[in-house]
């Protein structure tokens, strides 16, 4: 989470309603929030403010016209899948474990379309139950 916090601070985060619900009504500090939902009402507030858009295209349009902040798509699975078409850079955390009965997954990525910029491995330790790798990719120019 420290990497997520450092990376997204000062940016705009776009997420689906279920991901937003997982925040338990908290607004993450130092970030603009856009929630993609057809059920939330525009302008609702819970411990801060956020914008509601009905689809990813309108969320991206709002983010691009309202600020020059970097934009991060932070989930869930269907928002990730749809957002991959627009992504210029990927920040992936690969955790070296198998989760039994998992129901949500990051979509498959064709890495032949991307340049690996960095891969930083971390061992399991007292703070991390499993080893993991932080990976950064940039989209290849066509």
Q: What would you call each of these model-derived segments?
A:
Residues 1-142:
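Enzymes that bind and transform nitrogen-containing heteroaromatic metabolites
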């Amino acid at each position: 989470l420290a990497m997520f916090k450092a990376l997204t601070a000062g940016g705009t985060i776009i997420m689906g309603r279920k991901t937003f619900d997982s925040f338990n009504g908290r607004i993450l500090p130092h970030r603009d929030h856009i929630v993609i939902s057809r059920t939330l009402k525009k302008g609702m507030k819970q411990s801060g403010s956020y914008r509601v858009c009905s689809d990813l295209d309108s969320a991206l349009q709002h983010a691009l016209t309202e600020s020059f902040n970097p934009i991060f798509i932070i989930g869930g699975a269907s928002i990730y899948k749809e957002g991959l078409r627009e992504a210029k850079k990927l920040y992936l955390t690969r955790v070296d474990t198998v989760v039994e009965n998992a129901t949500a997954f990051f979509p498959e990525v064709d890495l032949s379309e991307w340049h690996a910029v960095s891969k930083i491995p971390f061992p399991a330790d007292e703070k991390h139950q499993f080893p993991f790798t932080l990976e950064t990719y940039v989209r290849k120019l066509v």
